[in-house]
Design a protein with these regions (language model features):
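Catalytic machinery of carbohydrate-active enzymes
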Residues: 1-357
Length: 357
């Protein structure tokens, strides 16, 4: 069934967005936020998001207020969800957009009572209350584009944007600089960032291969920097165990999310799996080589002019959920991606970036 298009006036409104996904997802909606801000002159834009990832958009100029929601902690229950919705309702929202519909987004929406409500349904109940219901996950476009299509269906004509972007602060930049200085890094040094983990083991290119890639670029004069969260340190240790070079920096567990974003921007090249750090490096203008296995590179690849996704197989577009793909076993393991292909992609990215300067 063909879905409807609408014409929405976004100017001089209080606009609430509900989007409670993960680190990388928050980076992927930055073009949406940029276009909405341009269209919504005189409006206040509020973003309801997972409290764990609020640093990812803390300094985004296209968001006026973040409403953090501790959905895995003290606000996990339905009563807390309803309470937050009632609190937001006191701001008298003119427009509510749910970019990822869930039972929780439905409850929030019903509690806040916006004048107009659009986006993705969280339950069948939503269709009785929504003014502009739509299917957002159509499995035929990149994550960035599927959210821009929401605005297009709401009548926005000018969809041009600056790509995925993350924004830091002078404080984060200062702390990132201090960290690098403590590791003996000078302003002339070139760094290669590596993020060896992801949300699930099946999405991880072998850590030992990351170590060998790090060795190759260390020989070229770049200093490998291993980023990550503390739980990824065992993986990083496997990578380090495969290295001959003893010159590397272990940044995992030593930087906040915002400080990582600042530190990532200092790199000349990055290697990652399909993960939040992939989008961060890319959003900071770093040539990013991203390895994909059971997740679909066509939906999630980095967008930078010098970035590239390498997939273990040509996954067709269509309905996809990485956990279901893993459970089915209908994919080529990410370990099948060769080290030689990854190194060649990195060399090409560096050369292309140099030509673009």
């Amino acid at each position: 069934m063909e879905e409807k298009n609408y014409h929405v006036d976004f100017k001089n409104k209080t606009i609430v967005l509900i989007y409670m996904l993960y680190f990388g997802d928050m980076v992927s909606i930055s073009p949406f936020l940029e276009v909405l801000r341009r269209e919504a002159k005189g409006s206040k834009i509020l973003l309801v998001m997972d409290a764990r990832f609020q640093e990812s958009v803390k300094y985004n100029p296209n968001v006026d207020e973040i409403i953090p929601f501790d959905r895995h902690g003290k606000e996990k229950g339905m009563a807390a969800t309803w309470k937050l919705g009632k609190k937001i309702g006191k701001l008298h929202p003119d427009i509510l957009l749910t970019l990822h519909g869930t039972t929780r987004s439905t409850l929030l929406a019903l509690a806040m009572g916006p004048k107009h409500w659009g986006g993705e349904e969280g339950t069948r109940l939503d269709s009785f209350f929504m003014d502009w219901p739509m299917t957002i996950e159509t499995y035929n476009s990149h994550a960035v584009d599927k959210y821009l299509k929401v605005l297009e269906r709401l009548g926005v004509k000018d969809l041009h944007h600056s790509g995925m972007r993350t924004f830091t602060s002078p404080e984060w930049e200062k702390k990132a600089d201090a960290f690098y200085k403590s590791q003996g890094v000078s302003s002339e040094d070139r760094l290669v960032g590596l993020s060896v983990g992801s949300s699930t083991a099946e999405k991880n290119w072998p850590a030992e291969k990351y170590g060998q890639v790090a060795d190759h670029f260390a020989e070229k004069g770049l200093i490998p920097v291993f980023f990550g969260v503390p739980s990824e340190i065992p993986l990083i240790e496997k990578a380090l165990g495969a290295m001959k070079s003893k010159r590397y920096i272990l940044a995992a567990g030593k930087l906040s999310m915002g400080e990582f974003m600042a530190a990532a921007g200092r790199c000349s090249l990055a290697f990652t799996n399909d993960s939040g750090p992939m989008y961060v490096f890319d959003s900071r203008g770093v040539p990013t080589i991203a390895m994909f296995g059971p997740s679909n590179a066509k939906f999630h690849h980095p967008l930078g002019p010098c970035s590239r996704a390498i997939s273990s197989f040509d996954m067709p577009m269509g309905q996809e959920h990485v956990n279901k793909t893993i459970a089915s076993g209908n994919y080529t393991p990410i370990s099948e991606i060769s080290m030689e292909e990854v190194i060649a992609a990195g060399e090409e990215a560096l050369e292309k970036a140099l030509k673009m300067k």
